[in-house]
């Protein structure tokens, strides 16, 4: 399966350098081409939506950008720097998988403190405020394994809100969210974009309507 790149929507170029630029990325599995070649960039103050059906390689792309997989060819520039190390990417990128990256035997609040110990968090935000934002104040001491799927998703959004990373990679963040959760995610994304952060998010279906500047990267099967 080969993914082709369709040019993003036309927008005036940003005066600031891209938060991330991908150059001729390719990836294959068992000698079968999966992705590429892909060329795109993510500017400060905007969201890039990666759209395509399930199985097309959206999650693979995010894992490559996050440094969890290696592309077969091409390279990625982070803040115009080539070949960044894993710690540098961790400081620059927050990756929210479609599977919650939570410690099941820690409480909701302990999970947020654990995140701080690993990566730090936004200097003007606290774990307690994050739990309030996502409506989990009453579950601060509840073990994650005792939370519902919806509550775990909200806790993941609290982790995201606390992240100091300027670039967010979000794998199908709107999946399984109720209308209130969609409003909450839009609020978090808007706050991030308005502070000149950048976001790349994936969707298998219709392009989500976001209250921020967006561009589109459409992946499809090669003819």
Curated annotation (Swiss-Prot):
Disulfide bond is among the record's keywords: no
Location in the cell: Cell inner membrane
Catalysed transformations (reactions): heme b(in) + ATP + H2O = heme b(out) + ADP + phosphate + H(+)
Membrane disposition: Peripheral membrane protein
Residues that bind ATP: 52-59
Enzyme class: translocase
Enzyme Commission (EC) number: 7.6.2.5
Domain ABC transporter: 20-222
GO biological process: cytochrome complex assembly
Subcellular location, principal: membrane
Pfam families found in the cross-reference section: ABC_tran
GO cellular component: plasma membrane
GO molecular function terms attached to this record: ABC-type heme transporter activity; ATP binding; ATP hydrolysis activity
SMART domains: AAA
Keyword Nucleus: no
Keywords: ATP-binding, Cell inner membrane, Cell membrane, Cytochrome c-type biogenesis, Membrane, Nucleotide-binding, Translocase, Transport
Quaternary structure, from the entry: The complex is composed of two ATP-binding proteins (CcmA) and two transmembrane proteins (CcmB).
Similarity-based family: Belongs to the ABC transporter superfamily. CcmA exporter (TC 3.A.1.107) family.
Role this protein plays: Part of the ABC transporter complex CcmAB involved in the biogenesis of c-type cytochromes; once thought to export heme, this seems not to be the case, but its exact role is uncertain. Responsible for energy coupling to the transport system.
Official protein name in the record: Cytochrome c biogenesis ATP-binding export protein CcmA
Native source organism of the sequence: Xylella fastidiosa (strain 9a5c)
Gene: ccmA
């Amino acid at each position: 399966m080969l993914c082709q790149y369709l040019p993003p929507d036309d927008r005036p170029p940003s005066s600031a350098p891209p938060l991330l630029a991908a150059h001729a990325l390719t990836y294959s599995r068992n000698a079968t081409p999966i992705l590429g070649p892909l060329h795109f960039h993510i500017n400060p103050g905007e969201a890039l939506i990666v759209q395509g059906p399930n199985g097309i390689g959206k999650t693979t792309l995010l894992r490559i950008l996050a440094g969890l997989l290696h592309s077969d060819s091409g390279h990625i520039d982070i803040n115009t720097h080539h070949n960044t190390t894993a710690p540098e990417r961790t400081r620059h990128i927050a990756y929210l998988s479609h599977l919650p990256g939570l410690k099941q035997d820690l409480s909701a609040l302990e999970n947020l403190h654990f995140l701080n110990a690993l990566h730090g968090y936004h200097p003007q935000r606290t774990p307690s405020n994050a739990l309030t934002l996502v409506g989990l104040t009453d579950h601060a001491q509840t073990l994650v394994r005792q939370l519902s799927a919806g509550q775990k998703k909200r806790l993941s959004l609290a982790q995201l809100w606390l992240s100091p990373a300027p670039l967010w990679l979000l794998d199908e963040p709107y999946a399984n969210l109720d209308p209130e959760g969609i409003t909450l995610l839009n609020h978090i994304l808007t706050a991030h974009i308005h502070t000149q952060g950048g976001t790349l998010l994936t969707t298998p279906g219709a392009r989500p309507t976001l209250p921020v500047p967006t561009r589109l990267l459409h992946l499809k099967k090669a003819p």
